[in-house]
Regions:
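N-terminal ordered "arm"
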Residues: 18-50
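Active-site helix-to-loop segments that bind/position phosphate- or nucleotide-bearing substrates
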Residues: 1-19, 29, 89-272
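A surface-exposed, charged beta-strand/loop segment in the N-terminal or early-internal portion
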Residues: 40, 48-121
Protein backbone atom coordinates (compact mmCIF):
# COMPACT_ATOMS: atom_id res chain seq x y z
CA UNK A 1 0.00 0.00 0.00
CA UNK A 2 1.35 3.38 -0.98
CA UNK A 3 1.44 5.99 1.74
CA UNK A 4 -0.01 9.29 0.57
CA UNK A 5 2.43 12.12 1.21
CA UNK A 6 2.45 15.83 0.51
CA UNK A 7 3.23 17.89 -2.57
CA UNK A 8 5.43 20.97 -2.15
CA UNK A 9 4.34 23.83 -4.42
CA UNK A 10 6.97 26.57 -4.81
CA UNK A 11 5.25 29.58 -6.37
CA UNK A 12 7.98 32.20 -5.90
CA UNK A 13 9.60 32.62 -9.34
CA UNK A 14 13.00 33.59 -7.90
CA UNK A 15 13.17 30.63 -5.52
CA UNK A 16 16.02 28.12 -5.67
CA UNK A 17 15.65 24.66 -4.15
CA UNK A 18 18.53 22.75 -2.58
CA UNK A 19 19.15 19.85 -0.23
CA UNK A 20 20.49 20.19 3.30
CA UNK A 21 20.87 16.71 4.75
CA UNK A 22 17.36 15.29 4.58
CA UNK A 23 15.63 18.65 4.19
CA UNK A 24 14.52 20.61 1.15
CA UNK A 25 15.55 24.24 1.51
CA UNK A 26 13.77 26.95 -0.48
CA UNK A 27 15.83 30.13 -0.86
CA UNK A 28 15.48 33.53 -2.44
CA UNK A 29 19.07 34.79 -2.59
CA UNK A 30 20.19 34.75 1.07
CA UNK A 31 16.71 34.47 2.53
CA UNK A 32 15.42 31.03 3.52
CA UNK A 33 11.74 30.90 2.57
CA UNK A 34 11.09 27.45 3.93
CA UNK A 35 12.44 24.07 4.97
CA UNK A 36 10.55 20.82 4.40
CA UNK A 37 11.66 17.29 5.40
CA UNK A 38 12.23 15.26 2.25
CA UNK A 39 10.61 12.14 3.69
CA UNK A 40 7.28 14.00 3.96
CA UNK A 41 7.09 14.61 0.20
CA UNK A 42 5.89 12.62 -2.77
CA UNK A 43 6.23 15.47 -5.27
CA UNK A 44 7.70 18.95 -5.75
CA UNK A 45 6.19 21.44 -8.21
CA UNK A 46 8.24 24.55 -8.93
CA UNK A 47 6.96 27.66 -10.71
CA UNK A 48 10.40 29.25 -10.56
CA UNK A 49 13.08 29.78 -13.18
CA UNK A 50 16.21 29.57 -10.99
CA UNK A 51 16.10 25.81 -10.66
CA UNK A 52 16.98 22.98 -8.32
CA UNK A 53 20.34 21.75 -7.09
CA UNK A 54 21.76 18.53 -8.62
CA UNK A 55 21.84 16.97 -5.14
CA UNK A 56 18.11 17.51 -4.68
CA UNK A 57 17.39 16.19 -8.18
CA UNK A 58 19.35 13.04 -7.42
CA UNK A 59 17.58 12.54 -4.08
CA UNK A 60 14.19 12.94 -5.76
CA UNK A 61 14.96 10.43 -8.51
CA UNK A 62 16.38 7.90 -6.04
CA UNK A 63 13.29 8.11 -3.83
CA UNK A 64 10.74 8.34 -6.62
CA UNK A 65 9.70 11.87 -5.61
CA UNK A 66 8.15 13.65 -8.57
CA UNK A 67 9.89 16.87 -9.60
CA UNK A 68 7.97 19.07 -12.02
CA UNK A 69 8.72 22.51 -13.47
CA UNK A 70 6.01 24.91 -14.62
CA UNK A 71 6.23 28.45 -15.93
CA UNK A 72 5.02 31.24 -13.65
CA UNK A 73 1.74 31.11 -15.60
CA UNK A 74 1.30 27.38 -15.03
CA UNK A 75 2.49 26.03 -18.40
CA UNK A 76 4.16 22.64 -18.14
CA UNK A 77 7.91 22.80 -18.86
CA UNK A 78 9.55 19.57 -17.72
CA UNK A 79 9.46 16.67 -15.31
CA UNK A 80 12.50 14.98 -13.78
CA UNK A 81 12.31 11.25 -13.19
CA UNK A 82 14.70 8.42 -12.44
CA UNK A 83 15.30 5.21 -14.38
CA UNK A 84 12.25 3.60 -15.95
CA UNK A 85 10.67 1.19 -13.50
CA UNK A 86 8.55 -1.91 -13.93
CA UNK A 87 8.60 -4.88 -16.25
CA UNK A 88 9.66 -4.27 -19.85
CA UNK A 89 7.15 -6.94 -20.90
CA UNK A 90 4.37 -4.75 -19.49
CA UNK A 91 5.41 -1.84 -21.69
CA UNK A 92 5.78 -4.14 -24.69
CA UNK A 93 2.19 -5.32 -24.23
CA UNK A 94 1.08 -1.71 -23.81
CA UNK A 95 2.65 -0.81 -27.17
CA UNK A 96 1.09 -3.81 -28.89
CA UNK A 97 -2.36 -3.01 -27.52
CA UNK A 98 -2.15 0.66 -28.46
CA UNK A 99 -1.02 -0.27 -31.97
CA UNK A 100 -3.99 -2.62 -32.44
CA UNK A 101 -7.05 -0.37 -32.64
CA UNK A 102 -9.44 -3.28 -32.11
CA UNK A 103 -7.74 -4.17 -28.82
CA UNK A 104 -7.50 -0.52 -27.80
CA UNK A 105 -11.18 0.18 -28.51
CA UNK A 106 -12.68 -1.55 -25.41
CA UNK A 107 -10.23 0.34 -23.19
CA UNK A 108 -11.15 3.62 -24.85
CA UNK A 109 -14.83 2.83 -24.31
CA UNK A 110 -14.26 2.24 -20.59
CA UNK A 111 -12.40 5.54 -20.26
CA UNK A 112 -15.16 7.49 -22.00
CA UNK A 113 -17.84 5.70 -19.99
CA UNK A 114 -16.18 6.98 -16.83
CA UNK A 115 -15.92 10.49 -18.25
CA UNK A 116 -19.56 10.70 -19.33
CA UNK A 117 -20.84 9.09 -16.14
CA UNK A 118 -18.96 11.61 -14.02
CA UNK A 119 -20.13 14.52 -16.20
CA UNK A 120 -23.71 13.38 -15.76
CA UNK A 121 -23.15 13.01 -12.02
CA UNK A 122 -21.91 16.61 -11.76
CA UNK A 123 -24.98 18.00 -13.52
CA UNK A 124 -27.30 15.85 -11.41
CA UNK A 125 -25.49 17.00 -8.27
CA UNK A 126 -26.07 20.68 -9.13
CA UNK A 127 -29.68 20.02 -10.16
CA UNK A 128 -30.37 18.32 -6.84
CA UNK A 129 -28.58 20.83 -4.61
CA UNK A 130 -29.42 24.11 -6.40
CA UNK A 131 -32.80 23.67 -8.12
CA UNK A 132 -33.82 27.31 -7.57
CA UNK A 133 -30.74 28.71 -9.32
CA UNK A 134 -30.70 26.62 -12.49
CA UNK A 135 -32.71 26.36 -15.66
CA UNK A 136 -33.92 22.86 -14.82
CA UNK A 137 -35.25 22.26 -18.32
CA UNK A 138 -31.89 23.00 -19.94
CA UNK A 139 -29.89 21.07 -17.35
CA UNK A 140 -32.28 18.14 -17.65
CA UNK A 141 -31.84 18.16 -21.43
CA UNK A 142 -28.07 18.09 -20.97
CA UNK A 143 -28.32 15.14 -18.61
CA UNK A 144 -30.58 13.28 -21.04
CA UNK A 145 -28.14 13.84 -23.91
CA UNK A 146 -25.26 12.48 -21.84
CA UNK A 147 -27.38 9.46 -20.88
CA UNK A 148 -28.11 8.89 -24.56
CA UNK A 149 -24.40 9.08 -25.36
CA UNK A 150 -23.66 6.55 -22.63
CA UNK A 151 -26.12 4.12 -24.22
CA UNK A 152 -24.42 4.53 -27.61
CA UNK A 153 -20.86 3.91 -26.39
CA UNK A 154 -21.00 0.08 -26.30
CA UNK A 155 -22.12 0.00 -29.96
CA UNK A 156 -19.30 2.21 -31.28
CA UNK A 157 -17.38 0.31 -33.96
CA UNK A 158 -14.23 2.43 -34.00
CA UNK A 159 -12.46 5.40 -32.44
CA UNK A 160 -14.03 7.86 -34.88
CA UNK A 161 -17.50 6.87 -33.69
CA UNK A 162 -16.33 7.23 -30.10
CA UNK A 163 -15.12 10.75 -30.76
CA UNK A 164 -18.45 11.64 -32.33
CA UNK A 165 -20.36 10.34 -29.31
CA UNK A 166 -17.99 12.16 -26.96
CA UNK A 167 -18.40 15.37 -28.95
CA UNK A 168 -22.19 15.27 -28.68
CA UNK A 169 -22.01 14.72 -24.93
CA UNK A 170 -19.42 17.49 -24.49
CA UNK A 171 -21.60 19.94 -26.44
CA UNK A 172 -24.56 19.18 -24.18
CA UNK A 173 -22.41 19.43 -21.05
CA UNK A 174 -20.79 22.77 -21.88
CA UNK A 175 -24.08 24.25 -23.09
CA UNK A 176 -25.26 24.34 -19.47
CA UNK A 177 -21.85 24.75 -17.84
CA UNK A 178 -22.22 28.54 -17.28
CA UNK A 179 -25.19 27.81 -14.98
CA UNK A 180 -22.88 25.89 -12.66
CA UNK A 181 -20.95 29.08 -11.85
CA UNK A 182 -23.12 30.03 -8.91
CA UNK A 183 -20.72 32.40 -7.17
CA UNK A 184 -19.48 35.66 -8.70
CA UNK A 185 -20.75 34.66 -12.13
CA UNK A 186 -20.31 38.24 -13.38
CA UNK A 187 -16.56 37.96 -12.74
CA UNK A 188 -16.27 34.58 -14.46
CA UNK A 189 -17.98 34.63 -17.86
CA UNK A 190 -17.76 31.35 -19.76
CA UNK A 191 -18.55 30.99 -23.47
CA UNK A 192 -17.17 27.51 -24.13
CA UNK A 193 -14.09 25.41 -23.49
CA UNK A 194 -10.89 26.95 -24.85
CA UNK A 195 -7.29 25.75 -24.67
CA UNK A 196 -3.84 26.87 -25.78
CA UNK A 197 -4.47 29.54 -24.75
CA UNK A 198 -7.47 29.55 -22.41
CA UNK A 199 -9.51 32.63 -23.22
CA UNK A 200 -11.13 33.40 -19.87
CA UNK A 201 -10.43 32.90 -16.15
CA UNK A 202 -12.57 29.75 -15.84
CA UNK A 203 -10.74 28.08 -18.71
CA UNK A 204 -7.43 29.22 -17.26
CA UNK A 205 -8.25 27.60 -13.90
CA UNK A 206 -9.43 24.40 -15.57
CA UNK A 207 -6.32 24.14 -17.75
CA UNK A 208 -4.06 24.83 -14.77
CA UNK A 209 -5.76 22.16 -12.66
CA UNK A 210 -5.57 19.65 -15.51
CA UNK A 211 -1.85 20.40 -15.95
CA UNK A 212 -1.15 19.63 -12.29
CA UNK A 213 -3.30 16.51 -12.33
CA UNK A 214 -1.85 15.29 -15.63
CA UNK A 215 1.64 15.58 -14.20
CA UNK A 216 0.62 13.51 -11.17
CA UNK A 217 -0.89 10.85 -13.44
CA UNK A 218 2.18 10.70 -15.68
CA UNK A 219 4.42 10.22 -12.65
CA UNK A 220 2.16 7.46 -11.30
CA UNK A 221 2.22 5.67 -14.67
CA UNK A 222 6.01 5.80 -14.82
CA UNK A 223 6.25 4.47 -11.27
CA UNK A 224 4.48 1.24 -12.28
CA UNK A 225 6.38 0.83 -15.54
CA UNK A 226 3.87 2.16 -18.06
CA UNK A 227 4.73 4.67 -20.78
CA UNK A 228 2.67 7.86 -20.28
CA UNK A 229 3.07 8.73 -23.97
CA UNK A 230 1.29 5.66 -25.36
CA UNK A 231 -2.47 5.76 -24.86
CA UNK A 232 -5.57 3.98 -26.10
CA UNK A 233 -7.99 6.87 -26.60
CA UNK A 234 -5.93 9.93 -27.49
CA UNK A 235 -3.93 9.72 -30.70
CA UNK A 236 -0.17 9.40 -30.36
CA UNK A 237 1.72 12.63 -30.91
CA UNK A 238 5.32 13.65 -30.13
CA UNK A 239 5.46 15.41 -26.78
CA UNK A 240 1.96 14.35 -25.73
CA UNK A 241 1.41 12.17 -22.65
CA UNK A 242 -1.46 10.31 -24.32
CA UNK A 243 -2.01 7.67 -21.64
CA UNK A 244 -1.98 10.32 -18.91
CA UNK A 245 -4.60 12.23 -20.90
CA UNK A 246 -6.61 9.02 -21.28
CA UNK A 247 -6.80 8.56 -17.52
CA UNK A 248 -7.43 12.25 -16.98
CA UNK A 249 -10.66 11.91 -18.98
CA UNK A 250 -12.47 10.39 -16.01
CA UNK A 251 -11.47 13.03 -13.50
CA UNK A 252 -12.59 16.50 -14.71
CA UNK A 253 -15.93 16.41 -12.86
CA UNK A 254 -14.16 16.50 -9.50
CA UNK A 255 -11.74 19.15 -10.73
CA UNK A 256 -14.59 21.29 -12.08
CA UNK A 257 -16.43 21.13 -8.77
CA UNK A 258 -13.39 22.48 -6.93
CA UNK A 259 -12.71 25.16 -9.54
CA UNK A 260 -16.29 26.41 -9.35
CA UNK A 261 -16.16 26.37 -5.56
CA UNK A 262 -13.07 28.59 -5.61
CA UNK A 263 -14.27 31.07 -8.24
CA UNK A 264 -13.74 34.31 -6.32
CA UNK A 265 -12.84 37.83 -7.49
CA UNK A 266 -9.40 37.58 -5.86
CA UNK A 267 -8.76 34.42 -7.90
CA UNK A 268 -9.46 36.36 -11.09
CA UNK A 269 -6.94 39.01 -10.05
CA UNK A 270 -4.30 36.32 -9.56
CA UNK A 271 -5.00 34.87 -13.00
CA UNK A 272 -4.81 38.24 -14.68
Amino acid sequence: MKRLQNTLYVTTPEAYLSLDGETVVVRNDDDVLGRVPLHNLEAIVSFGYRGVSPALMRACTERNIGLCFLSRHGRFLARVSGPVQGNVLLRTEQYRTADDRKRALPIAKMLLTGKLYNSRWLLEHFRRDHPQRLDLTAVGAGIDQIKSSLRLLPEAADHDMLRGIEGSAAKAYFSVFPQLILRNAQDFPFSGRSRRPPLDPVNAMLSFAYTLLGNEIAGALESVGLDPAVGFLHTLRPGRASLALDLLEELPAGVVKRVLKNARPETRRLIN
